[in-house]
Amino acid sequence: MSSCIQEIIQKLIAEYAPTKVILFGSHARGNPRPDSDIDLLIVKETSERFIDRWVMVRRILSDPQRMVGLETIVLTPQELSSRLAGGDQFLAEIVQNGKVLYAA
Protein backbone atom coordinates (compact mmCIF):
# COMPACT_ATOMS: atom_id res chain seq x y z
CA MET A 1 0.00 0.00 0.00
CA SER A 2 1.36 3.41 -0.90
CA SER A 3 2.44 5.87 1.76
CA CYS A 4 -0.20 8.30 0.46
CA ILE A 5 -2.97 5.76 1.11
CA GLN A 6 -1.55 4.94 4.56
CA GLU A 7 -1.49 8.63 5.41
CA ILE A 8 -5.10 9.08 4.29
CA ILE A 9 -6.26 6.08 6.35
CA GLN A 10 -4.43 7.22 9.48
CA LYS A 11 -5.92 10.72 9.22
CA LEU A 12 -9.38 9.28 8.62
CA ILE A 13 -9.11 6.98 11.66
CA ALA A 14 -7.82 9.77 13.90
CA GLU A 15 -10.32 12.43 12.87
CA TYR A 16 -13.45 10.56 11.74
CA ALA A 17 -13.34 7.21 13.60
CA PRO A 18 -14.92 4.98 10.95
CA THR A 19 -15.83 1.38 11.70
CA LYS A 20 -14.50 0.17 8.34
CA VAL A 21 -12.57 1.49 5.36
CA ILE A 22 -12.40 -0.47 2.10
CA LEU A 23 -10.11 0.46 -0.78
CA PHE A 24 -11.56 -0.35 -4.20
CA GLY A 25 -10.80 0.31 -7.82
CA SER A 26 -7.41 0.18 -9.49
CA HIS A 27 -5.42 0.68 -6.28
CA ALA A 28 -7.15 -2.32 -4.68
CA ARG A 29 -6.55 -4.42 -7.79
CA GLY A 30 -2.88 -3.43 -7.76
CA ASN A 31 -2.88 -1.81 -11.18
CA PRO A 32 -3.21 1.95 -10.65
CA ARG A 33 -2.04 4.35 -13.32
CA PRO A 34 -0.33 7.63 -12.41
CA ASP A 35 -3.66 9.45 -12.86
CA SER A 36 -5.78 6.92 -10.91
CA ASP A 37 -7.97 8.15 -8.06
CA ILE A 38 -7.90 6.56 -4.63
CA ASP A 39 -11.38 5.08 -4.11
CA LEU A 40 -12.63 4.45 -0.56
CA LEU A 41 -15.83 3.06 0.92
CA ILE A 42 -16.06 4.42 4.47
CA VAL A 43 -18.52 2.89 6.92
CA LYS A 44 -19.47 4.68 10.14
CA GLU A 45 -22.34 4.47 12.60
CA THR A 46 -23.78 7.98 12.64
CA SER A 47 -27.06 9.87 12.44
CA GLU A 48 -25.62 12.55 10.13
CA ARG A 49 -27.17 13.00 6.71
CA PHE A 50 -25.37 11.42 3.75
CA ILE A 51 -24.24 14.76 2.30
CA ASP A 52 -23.01 15.99 5.70
CA ARG A 53 -20.90 12.83 6.12
CA TRP A 54 -19.42 13.24 2.68
CA VAL A 55 -18.58 16.92 3.26
CA MET A 56 -16.96 16.15 6.62
CA VAL A 57 -14.77 13.41 5.16
CA ARG A 58 -13.77 15.67 2.25
CA ARG A 59 -12.78 18.42 4.70
CA ILE A 60 -10.76 16.01 6.85
CA LEU A 61 -8.94 14.56 3.86
CA SER A 62 -8.52 17.80 1.93
CA ASP A 63 -4.87 18.31 1.02
CA PRO A 64 -4.01 20.70 -1.81
CA GLN A 65 -0.51 19.19 -2.04
CA ARG A 66 -1.77 15.64 -2.67
CA MET A 67 -1.21 14.91 -6.32
CA VAL A 68 -3.82 12.17 -6.57
CA GLY A 69 -7.61 12.34 -6.73
CA LEU A 70 -9.73 10.93 -3.93
CA GLU A 71 -13.25 9.52 -4.29
CA THR A 72 -15.23 8.53 -1.21
CA ILE A 73 -18.53 6.83 -0.44
CA VAL A 74 -19.60 7.26 3.18
CA LEU A 75 -22.37 4.93 4.42
CA THR A 76 -23.75 3.74 7.73
CA PRO A 77 -23.68 -0.02 8.39
CA GLN A 78 -27.47 -0.05 7.95
CA GLU A 79 -27.30 1.75 4.59
CA LEU A 80 -24.64 -0.65 3.37
CA SER A 81 -26.64 -3.71 4.45
CA SER A 82 -29.84 -2.36 2.95
CA ARG A 83 -28.23 -1.54 -0.38
CA LEU A 84 -26.53 -4.93 -0.56
CA ALA A 85 -29.83 -6.66 0.27
CA GLY A 86 -31.47 -4.57 -2.46
CA GLY A 87 -29.03 -5.91 -5.05
CA ASP A 88 -26.62 -2.98 -5.39
CA GLN A 89 -24.02 -4.63 -7.64
CA PHE A 90 -21.54 -1.75 -7.36
CA LEU A 91 -21.37 -2.06 -3.56
CA ALA A 92 -21.36 -5.87 -3.78
CA GLU A 93 -18.28 -5.64 -6.03
CA ILE A 94 -16.57 -3.32 -3.54
CA VAL A 95 -17.33 -5.58 -0.56
CA GLN A 96 -16.31 -8.76 -2.41
CA ASN A 97 -13.18 -7.52 -4.16
CA GLY A 98 -12.05 -4.43 -2.26
CA LYS A 99 -9.25 -4.44 0.30
CA VAL A 100 -10.29 -3.80 3.89
CA LEU A 101 -7.72 -1.30 5.14
CA TYR A 102 -9.30 -0.75 8.54
CA ALA A 103 -11.94 -2.45 10.67
CA ALA A 104 -12.69 -1.39 14.24
Where are these regions (language model features)?
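Glycine-rich beta-strand-to-loop/alpha-helix junction loops that act as flexible
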Residues: F24-S26
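Short beta-strand->loop micro-motif that forms the acidic, two-metal-ion catalytic signature
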Residues: D39-V43
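Catalytic core of pol beta-like nucleotidyltransferases
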Residues: M1-K20, R29-P34, K44-A104
